Amino acid sequence: MVLLAAAVCTKAGKAIVSRQFVEMTRTRIEGLLAAFPKLMNTGKQHTFVETESVRYVYQPMEKLYMVLITTKNSNILEDLETLRLFSRVIPEYCRALEENEISEHCFDLIFAFDEIVALGYRENVNLAQIRTFTEMDSHEEKVFRAVRETQEREAKAEMRRKAKELQQARRDAERQGKKAPGFGGFGSSAVSGGSTAAMITETIIETDKPKVAPAPARPSGPSKALKLGAKGKEVDNFVDKLKSEGETIMSSSMGKRTSEATKMHAPPINMESVHMKIEEKITLTCGRDGGLQNMELHGMIMLRISDDKYGRIRLHVENEDKKGVQLQTHPNVDKKLFTAESLIGLKNPEKSFPVNSDVGVLKWRLQTTEESFIPLTINCWPSESGNGCDVNIEYELQEDNLELNDVVITIPLPSGVGAPVIGEIDGEYRHDSRRNTLEWCLPVIDAKNKSGSLEFSIAGQPNDFFPVQVSFVSKKNYCNIQVTKVTQVDGNSPVRFSTETTFLVDKYEIL
């Protein structure tokens, strides 16, 4: 079977969306679709018509047609089966079978069509697999949007709460000022009230940085000296109040140093004309008493070529994985070549990879409940005492070849019981009194720093300290799949390339 094109058109032959799987000009495909309605015979029940050069296999969809254009020597049974799959794909992305709806989701349909057919030949996929393949790239964006919306809601709520607190503090200060002898009359009270109002305005503007102490405002007007003094006292009182609540207050210079250290930790990558991005994401759920409930890891090699002279290349893949991952190549990649020689190249060696776009050429997946596969084990042991709970938390790196950076282990705390009393700790900690969490921060966990512990005491019950959540990033991938060499198709000469490897957490919980 050789499929030339798949299209959705009107009954008059106007193309709404069309995907060509062979070299074909726009004029040619529009001419074929325009001739299609004239060939149909309404008196017959056939679902295909033929011309001297091509065959149309079609299915009516209300006021539209789903049309496959194939060669005349193709297998009509396979054509009909493929047509049914195309017809089932369209309602997945379009709520109504109308021209406007099809046009609005044209790119989604084209991506789905590409999963069904590659270079004119049907791929062995079903509807569920097509849905999975096309939605995979948008998962990260959905997570990012959800996190951003949550942060915006929390920031607005925090802004309103802070404004109410500061207004209440102003009213209390005014009441105390009227009762205190020799306060200075209405003039001083008016100046103090004005500076407090300015402080409320600035706090609302700066709510995106709730943990940074606000700097004094620039003075303006004739009473600038009084405002500076009042402002400084109000800020000091506000900072002392936050510290009493358990907040960590950073100065602006400390914030700059932290930002600079983060930038130094992640130096820019020198990208060559051929650049590979290897990314893995892990989703893991463990029980508090031990045992792995589920672990799922997804990985992908993305290829980006910035110079068209390196379009016809092959990637030499070294797979040292011993955990049993499932590998899957892109439909346009020669699967036989990859299976036999671990080479990633196009089925048609005369074609080139796309230029200036990220192309996923290899995916892999690992799903297991084998406890020995856990990269970083976390043991949380809360034990009740007379005044609450003594909590011991330990971590241990099980994969010695990994180096985990920016590790944060987040432990929930009971609300309304104050800050925890920290005993022994490896690394640093942050207490967030608003979210009632304790964050255990470790800059690096590797073979030289495989294990560590944290001890603290606080009022509460053992169930209050779960679920424990973990986040980290790593420049070494978990499954040990690497691109070791890149060569050109013609002459097998080596090509310079760069690689960027990232292993990060999608979800990592101890329930």
Swiss-Prot record:
InterPro entries for this protein: AP2_Mu_C_sf, AP_mu_sigma_su, Coatomer_dsu, Longin-like_dom_sf, MHD
Modified positions (Phosphoserine) in chain numbering: 223, 244, 493
Chief site of localization: cytoplasm
UniProt-listed Gene3D superfamilies: 3.30.450.60, Mu homology domain, subdomain B
Domain MHD: 271-511
Keywords for this protein: Acetylation, Cytoplasm, Cytoplasmic vesicle, Dwarfism, ER-Golgi transport, Golgi apparatus, Membrane, Phosphoprotein, Protein transport, Transport
This protein's record includes keyword Nucleotide-binding: no
Localization per Swiss-Prot or TrEMBL: Cytoplasm; Golgi apparatus membrane; Cytoplasmic vesicle, COPI-coated vesicle membrane
Membrane topology of this protein: Peripheral membrane protein
GO MF, one example: RNA binding
Presence of the UniProt keyword Membrane in the record: yes
Listed Basic and acidic residues bias regions: 168-177
N6-acetyllysine: residues bearing it: 233, 241, 309, 351
Family the UniProt entry places it in: Belongs to the adaptor complexes medium subunit family. Delta-COP subfamily.
PANTHER family: COATOMER SUBUNIT DELTA (PTHR10121:SF0)
Record's disease association: Short stature-micrognathia syndrome: An autosomal dominant disorder characterized by facial dysmorphism, severe micrognathia, microcephaly, rhizomelic short stature, and mild developmental delay.
Quaternary structure (record): Oligomeric complex that consists of at least the alpha, beta, beta', gamma, delta, epsilon and zeta subunits.
Role description: Component of the coatomer, a cytosolic protein complex that binds to dilysine motifs and reversibly associates with Golgi non-clathrin-coated vesicles, which further mediate biosynthetic protein transport from the ER, via the Golgi up to the trans Golgi network. The coatomer complex is required for budding from Golgi membranes, and is essential for the retrograde Golgi-to-ER transport of dilysine-tagged proteins.
Name assigned to this protein: Coatomer subunit delta
